[in-house]
C-alpha cells in the first residue's frame, strides 16, 4: 500500500475500531507503532492481532491529564515519532436545550482539548527533526452537524479548524491533515437496530457502512511520502454521504 518501514507512529484511541485498524495498517506497512488507549484491557489480544515480532509499545495513561508525561517520559517511540494520529473520542448525546454542562465539558475535553495538548507536545519533537505527519481523525458530523450531538459536532469541527490553523503556522516539513469518517462498522454501530440502519443506508450512496481499514488506508496515505505535498486538507471517507 504505502511504504512506512522504519517510521515511528503514535496512535491514540487505539482501543476503538478505527484507532485499532489504523495501528494494524500502519504496522503492516512497516511502521513501529505506539498505542494509547484508555480501555485496552485485552492487551494480550493486541499483541496477538499484530504480526509476530511487533515493535508495538503499550502506552496507557489518562489522555486528558497526562499529555506532557506521555511525550516527555523516556519512551523512544514518542521522542522519535514521525507520524501522529489522534482518534480518541467519546459521545454524550442529548438535546441542546437539555444538555448538561458536564456532558459538554467532557466531550470537548477528550475529543478536542486533549488533542491540542498532545499535539503541542509532540510537535516540538517534530520541529527539532524538521519532519512530521499529523493526522487528526475527525468525523463527517463535524462538517455537516447531527441532531442531538451539539457537543460532539463542535469538538470534531474544532479539530478541523485546529488543523487548518496549525498548518498555516507550522513549517519544517510538517504536514497537518484530517480524515473524516462517516458511518463505520464498530461496536457503536452494532448496537443500532435494523430500522436505524436502514435509515442510515438511505443517506449513503454506496449503501453500506465503511470499515476501519478503509479509514486507516487514508491515514496511511497521509503518513507516507506520497502525501508530502498534501497539507491542511480533510479527506472524507463516508461512502458519498456528504460530498464536500
Swiss-Prot record:
Key words, A-Z: NAD, Nodulation, Oxidoreductase, Plasmid
Pfam families: adh_short_C2 (PF13561)
Catalytic residues in the record: 152
SUPFAM superfamilies attached to this UniProt entry: NAD(P)-binding Rossmann-fold domains (SSF51735)
GO biological process entries: lipid metabolic process; monocarboxylic acid metabolic process
Superkingdom of this protein's organism: Bacteria
Binding site for NAD(+): 11-35
Chain residues that bind substrate: 139
UniProt xrefs under Gene3D superfamilies: NAD(P)-binding Rossmann-like Domain
Family: Belongs to the short-chain dehydrogenases/reductases (SDR) family.
Biological role: Proposed to modify Nod factor fatty acyl chain.
UniProt protein name: Nodulation protein G
Species name: Rhizobium meliloti
Lineage: Bacteria, Pseudomonadati, Pseudomonadota, Alphaproteobacteria, Hyphomicrobiales
Gene label: nodG
